[in-house]
């Protein structure tokens, strides 16, 4: 028996679906197997999944847990090939995969430039974008009378907001959209993943070079200006890497959040009625959606820097740990016996959908702002909005990370 077999003997196990065909079903199976589950990823790579809210919350705050992939034992032993399908999600160097002083250095400049004030300044532009997209929805009606809300609202809202935020010129945006679509896919061939990484990096590098010459009122220009005032803060490559992190997380999370919220409301008419009651329940809709149907179902990885015990199970030093946000979002031990229900009136909604601790998502306030504006205005403009297809037939995004559907056909009804 190998050391790995000895450490996992008798431990619950689950093979995760790289296609993400059933995030919530898989999340339920994780919870059924116990708080700590050994999981198999594509390429027969093994990791751990901690499927209980309180335990995952403790882990992300534990100083013995690292985000740095250099602490992944299998990676250091040469057991993870460069063409592993998920390598692009893991083997990167940025503020998400850094610890300690290095993490503080990488995050400091972003925290100074991507402020609450800058997010609030995006409110009028976000409102303008949403209004324009809502105006155009009837023109996108298909022959069967439906409109794909993912394609024509949920997708372009964060894409346009982030493009404006970064100062990305119009002529670069079509290529950006094509590249972003592939970032969270876990069903692509390794060579496609690698080529896409290069493409999106080169595009953002061009944006940084442009804003270095032509400053604007955008985050990229602000980062470059701050970097010039403090040269040791970030290298030019790190500025590009920072933009890539914010783009990857900011777009996909907000897109899926809007889609999941609309789908939840249209399949829970009592909750939709409550949301439209006039008491401004839209922020509560956003928070309950983040808990009940987290936009990111699973998120890699953390690594113990020593053997740790979690719920009576030893996770060896250097083993990767997955954060299963879909699973912990419906953890009855945290959210009560009705954790599986969608209830926007739920008190004290506490979720981990945006992470927690020093690595919590910097873009969470912007995602909340975009989603709240989009939802409030959508249902005010189209109060009779209804689903245009059986919700059980909507195909999932092919990703073990992103949790959403590839289309959201709706019938608009009368315009208010």
Regions found by a protein language model. Name each.
Residues 1-416:
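Cytochrome P450
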